[in-house]
Amino acid sequence: MANPKLVLAYSGGLDTSVAIKWLQERGYDVIACCLDLGEGKDLDFVKEKALKVGAIKSYVIDVKDEFANEYALIALQANALYEGKYPLVSALSRPLIAKKLVEIAELEGAVAVAHGCTGKGNDQVRFEVSIKALNPDLDVIAPVREWSWSREEEIEYAKKHGIPIPVDLDSPFSIDQNLWGRSNECGILEDPWAAPPEEAYELTASLENAPDVPDVIEIGFEQGVPVTLNGKAYPLAQMILELNAIAGKHGVGRIDHVENRLVGIKSREVYECPGAMTLIKAHKELEDLTLVREVAHFKPLIEQKIAEVIYNGLWFSPLKDALVAFLKETQKNVTGVVRVKLFKGHAIVEGRKSPFSLYDEKLATYTSEDEFDHQAAVGFISLYGLPTKVNSIVNKQNKSSVSTGQ
């Protein structure tokens, strides 16, 4: 009788390489799945490594465009920053990874999927909730959470089974990267008082090493979608990668954040998101120009909720779908060009224009070209302030009655 098949989210690192053997020992034929999310890793090597370790099949799927257009774009249009800081680098990729795991499992007739998450992180929740939303019949196995080995025990197991030990195993940092940015934790970063060492960064220059001359760029949007960079059309994934290089050179997008994890603990994380933070800044400025006041004031409430929903692993949920429906409605007129200066860690918006601009210079100016009806302000103020006036009159009358004993 053939062994049951299982699809493993495979990174090529020690944990998921050991997981292949560990799952085989429990009777599974393991199919490895690795996605190209724009992290720049040699994925051909990863594919071959999975097969050498013992996987019966190894998938490597380029999902950069899908990730950019269907995941990162929603976060961008929501100006999504979890707790006002974190642009959801890892949180955005997990539902897409889960989706591909399920698709391959269904294609291959697998009975289960597996991931390499520990028992104290957010990703285990994001993966497992997403998988159950997409196919509740699949079993989900978390080998690292189950085996509870020390690092030394895991290395010993790897040596015993001929599993290659990664050359970067001595690095104190735990890193996750995709085209939307790079996250870094562990090592000295676990001390919230300790300054992150420069070796913790890869995508961004320090302020000391950033150029002394700024770059000024222009980003074009159509209905909330970035479409041009300096007048040249780009697919979104490529534009993000271009901005990672340009803005990263100037030290834009470094984030040092103590965040509240879904599992109830606080965690100190260091992020590098030069492209994401530049795009969010430009997009928000274009919205300021094109959204009516009521929408502009209400949308941040939705943005905060979308960020929480994504962070908390509820991508495949009715709530997220409803929030995104509102979000899409707000983007119809978010078309135009934003000029941004990149310099010494800052993305500074210097100009914005749009055919849907609600800024009317003839109404805003204080020159002789002013067309604002100043006399209309008298009636407006009277009506606007009427509830406050009535409240004051009533309070004074009652205060007078109390003081006279009436």
From Swiss-Prot:
UniProt EC number: 6.3.4.5
A GO cellular component entry from the record: cytoplasm
Keywords, in A-Z order: Amino-acid biosynthesis, Arginine biosynthesis, ATP-binding, Cytoplasm, Ligase, Nucleotide-binding
InterPro entries in alphabetical order: Arginosuc_syn_C (IPR048268), Arginosuc_syn_N (IPR048267), Arginosuc_synth (IPR001518), Arginosuc_synth_CS (IPR018223), Arginosuc_synth_type_1_subfam (IPR023434), AS_cat/multimer_dom_body (IPR024074), Rossmann-like_a/b/a_fold (IPR014729)
Catalytic activity: L-citrulline + L-aspartate + ATP = 2-(N(omega)-L-arginino)succinate + AMP + diphosphate + H(+)
Pfam family, one: Arginosuc_syn_C
Primary localization: cytoplasm
Disulphide bonds in the chain: none
MF terms (GO), sorted A to Z: argininosuccinate synthase activity; ATP binding
Residues that coordinate or bind ATP: 9-17, 116
Compartments, record wording: Cytoplasm
GO biological process: argininosuccinate metabolic process; L-arginine biosynthetic process; urea cycle
Family label: Belongs to the argininosuccinate synthase family. Type 1 subfamily.
PANTHER family linked: ARGININOSUCCINATE SYNTHASE
Subunit structure as annotated in this protein's UniProt entry: Homotetramer.
Protein name as it appears in the record: Argininosuccinate synthase
Organism: Geobacillus thermodenitrificans (strain NG80-2)
Taxon lineage: Bacteria, Bacillati, Bacillota, Bacilli, Bacillales
Gene name per UniProt: argG
